[in-house]
Amino acid sequence: KKKNAAFEFCEADYFLAYRDDKIVGRVAAIINNQANKKWECKNVRFGWIDFIDDPEVSSALIKTVEEWGKERGMTHIAGPLGFTDFDAEGMLIEGFDQLSTMGTIYNYPYYPIHMEKLGFEKDADWVEYKIYIPDAITDKHKRISELIQRKYNLKIKKYTSGRKIAKDYGQKIFELMNEAYSPLYGYSPLTQRQIDQYVKMYLPILDLRMVTLITDANDELVCVGISMPSLAEALQKSNGRLLPLGWFYLLKALFMK
């Protein structure tokens, strides 16, 4: 809890389901007080939920979260959700044969069936798209880009140093995210401590060739584009472990393409 800045405004407990001394399920119960205040609700969140294909297990996990929330004055339950939008969210309902990105949740097809039987209804849709990038940018798109840059006096900025981009724009990047993400489902703004953590966690490992900043006439940051290689295949090869060779697969996916 000391390491996770989200505990400045969140509280949580974690539960395991056992049968015959074997773990058959898990779930986190979370209250994001900041999000509840912003969205004027009293939601307890369930997150990081996993269970075997047994309704008794899934029901026990959800009921445990419900009771935990009721004891703390909550009136509704929602999930899967993490502490913030930077945690994995949602439940896969189609595309089970597709390889997802690292930041999304994969679950077996029986998961949403269990949720429906427990009385849950869909509250929001998240859609993941695959966009194919052309080998070369067309002249038309180049002309449009140049026209917009001239019209609004925009400047494109690229960096080659993670420390330099963190120093110059680390704070501003996450302030812009707070503003842009504000209307999104369940979003709660990042605190200063969270911003400091994310700047240290993410900016040093980004391939800066795939990071683009756009500033206006006053040198204010108005847009940021961050792309990252998928680590899904690397995590499969490493079996989710850094040793003995997991670190190599991850570094190769990040920087060697």
Task: Identify the residue ranges that each predicted region occupies.
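Acyl-donor binding region in acyl/amide transferases
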Residues: K37-G119, A124, S238-K257
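Acyltransferase donor/substrate-recognition loop-hinge adjacent to the catalytic core
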Residues: I105-G186, M210, C223
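Conserved beta-strand positions that form and line the central face of beta-propeller blades
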Residues: R45, K155, L213
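Feature marks short, surface-exposed loop/turn motifs that line or immediately flank catalytic pockets
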Residues: N33, F83-D87, D135, L231-E233
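A general structural signal for short secondary-structure junctions and capping/turn motifs
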Residues: A6-E8, W68-K70, L118-E121, E146-I148, ...
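A conserved beta-strand-loop-helix scaffold within acyl/acetyltransferase catalytic domains
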Residues: K1-D21, V27-K38, K158-K257
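A short, polar/charged loop/turn motif at coil->beta-strand junctions and beta-hairpin connectors
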Residues: E11, I23, E40, D123, ...
